[in-house]
From Swiss-Prot:
Protein name: 4-hydroxy-tetrahydrodipicolinate synthase
Gene name as annotated: dapA
Listed GO CC annotations: cytosol
Pathways per UniProt: Amino-acid biosynthesis; L-lysine biosynthesis via DAP pathway; (S)-tetrahydrodipicolinate from L-aspartate: step 3/4
Single biological process term from Gene Ontology: lysine biosynthetic process via diaminopimelate
UniProt keyword annotation of Coiled coil present: no
GO MF, any single term: 4-hydroxy-tetrahydrodipicolinate synthase activity
Enzyme Commission (EC) number: 4.3.3.7
A Pfam family recorded for this sequence: DHDPS
């Protein structure tokens, strides 16, 4: 990893949704959304992750979403392409495609469902490391993958050339300090939990791969900039403004509430792919109230 690339993977990186229309990837809406994200101050973009409904994208759709994001971003902000799979061979293929397309880095989730041991996790990420020449961000998300990568395994992986950091969705705030003490400040630590992102940075984190930033990119960027500058009074004010979104957008399975919010703001339809379905009326009311609280929706 070059020092320049590492220094750019900071702040608010949006875990982008993938818009659909009539069952197909809506590339026009996606490109417009990418432009808006950059205009609103997002520090980076992360397509084809969990929020981007990657499990229900075909391989060709997955690749096209990554290509469109990189093309539209045009180097203005870094693009960290989701490239995870519980098949090591597929993770390698997606990571290699992302590198060919011009991604700045890839985000690789810990393999889900098949529950590898720590030795298996190491072998999986080493295989991806050996197959590409761009930075790799480990995505550690035990609530979805069932397994939890240990700090010791992560430290071993950091010795490899391309392992650059972690998206930490463990919800264990003490992990930030443990990982920082084990690997040093050059190991990029990005929160995967919007509601705890302020505290995450206080422990030495470098930013957040944010779901809420889909809806409130400027506010999320301002929050991250305040924490990284040590202005926690300003950060707390922004946190209070964002907090109802940080909870309301997870009232049902992500990204259903996010897509509803974006449909209310006029960015795209709320269309999802099965087995995800549109949110219920009670959740719509929760999201609407959160949008109003943040000053994003005026009736």
């Amino acid at each position: 990893m070059t020092e320049m690339t590492g220094s750019r993977l900071r702040g608010s990186l949006t875990a982008l949704v993938t818009p659909f229309r009539d069952g197909a990837f809506d590339e026009a809406a996606f490109r417009k959304f990418v432009r808006w994200q950059i205009e609103q101050g997002s520090h980076g973009l992360v397509p084809t992750g969990t929020t981007g409904e990657s499990p229900t994208l075909t391989h060709s759709e997955h690749d096209r979403v990554v290509e469109a994001c990189i093309d539209e971003a045009g180097g203005r902000v870094p693009v960290v392409a989701g490239a995870g799979s519980n098949s090591t061979a597929e993770a390698v293929e997606r990571a290699q495609h992302a590198e060919r397309a011009g991604a700045d880095a890839v985000l690789v989730v810990t393999p889900y469902y098949n529950k590898p041991t720590q030795a298996g996790l190491y072998a999986h990420f080493k295989a991806v490391n050996d197959a590409v020449g761009i930075p790799i961000i480990i995505y550690n998300i035990p609530p979805r993958s069932v397994i939890d990568m240990s700090v010791e395994t992560m430290a071993r992986l950091f010795e490899l050339k391309n392992i650059a950091g972690v998206k930490d969705a463990t919800a264990k705030i003490d992990r930030v300090s443990q990982q920082r003490q084990a690997m040093g400040d050059s190991f990029i630590q990005l929160s995967g939990e919007d509601a705890t992102a302020l505290g995450y940075n206080a422990h030495g984190g470098h930013g957040c791969i944010s779901v809420v930033a889909n809806v409130a990119p400027r506010l999320c960027a301002d929050l991250q900039e305040a924490t990284l500058a040590g202005d926690y009074a300003k950060a707390l004010t922004l946190q209070d403004r964002l907090f109802p979104l940080q909870t309301g957008l997870f009232a049902e399975a992500n990204p259903a509430p996010v897509k509803y919010a974006l449909s209310r703001l006029g960015h795209m339809t709320d269309e999802l792919r099965l087995p995800l379905v549109p949110v219920t009326e009670p959740t719509k009311r929760i999201v609407d109230d959160a949008l109003r609280h943040a000053g994003l929706l005026v009736d």
